[in-house]
Amino acid sequence: YVRLCMPKAKIAIHQTWAYEQDSHRLNIELGYKNHTDMFEDVRASYEKAAKDIKVDFIIPSGEVFQRLIESGIEKVHRDTFHASYGLGRYALGLLWYSILSGNDVKQNTFCDFDEEISKTEIEKAKECVAELCSI
């Protein structure tokens, strides 16, 4: 319907992320041994969905979380599965801003967070988003 009514519109899907390492949901409810295995399944599912429904691009939110976690920053969840009010939401906001506007996030000065975020975490989030958006 969107393509019929707005043929020039770009259609995207928002990729979700893996649950927090060692959480009940991840290990018991879903049976994963670690968040990396879950993320690999999430990524594959979104790639398949994108192809099946012919979207123009994926907003790689799960990829941002995964990169932050792999860099040693693990405070991206607030309750083992939702984005934290601080770093998680900030990283997602940077990603959406960069993807939708085409602007570089490295000079972004936003700093009104719902939870405290260290300067190191702010810079790491910007770095992860900038790397993803340059691919």
Identify the role of each PLM range.
Residues 1-86, 98:
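Alpha-helical cap/lid subdomain in secreted, periplasmic
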Residues 76, 80-87, 91-135:
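Conserved catalytic region of serine esterases and O-acyltransferases that act on ester linkages
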